[in-house]
Amino acid sequence: MPESLPDHLAVMSETVADWTPDQLRCGDLDGESSPCEIGAHKASVEFVVWGDSHAQATFEALEQAAHHSDTKGLFLSRGACPPLPGFQPEGGGFVLGCPAFNEYAMQTINRLQPRSVILIARWVAYRYPHSQKTSAATAEDAMLALVHTLQESGIRVAIMDEVPYSAYCIPSTFGTGI
C-alpha cells in the first residue's frame, strides 16, 4: 500500500511506528517493561513522568530536557492507561493491567517522594461521553483526587495538555482524497 501513495503521504504512513529503542524499552506497551531513569545520573529522583502512550511520545524530549537541566527523573508509561487511579471508562477500554500499573505508579511515587509529577495522556479519550457517573470515578473526579493526594504529600503536579484534537483521522482523510 505505501508504494501506491504519493510521496508526502508515504512519509506520514512510515512515521506511525517511528519509536526509538528507548521509547520502546521505557514505555510499558507490552506489560513487561520497567520504569526508566532519565536525565542526570544522580542519587535521587526529582520528578516522575506518568502517563499513557502520549507520555511515551514525549520521552525523547523529556530525556533531553532532564539531561540539559541536570535533573533525574523516572519515566512510567503504559499505552491506553491514563494516570488516573480509580478511573474506569464506561464500557472498559483499558489495556489489561491498567489498574495494577496505576497502583504501582502511586506506590513508586509515594516511596520516592519526588519534587514533581508530570501527568501526560490523551485526555480527550477519557473525557465525557467515555467517562460516566456510573464508572468507578469520572475522569475529572479521578484527576482532582490524584492532584489532591499528590499535593497533600508536598509534590508539585504538572498536567501536560494534549495537542489539538481532530475529530477525523487525518491520514485516513488524506488517503480518501487520492
Which residues make up each language-model segment?
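Extracellular/periplasmic envelope-modification machinery, especially enzymes
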Residues: 1-178
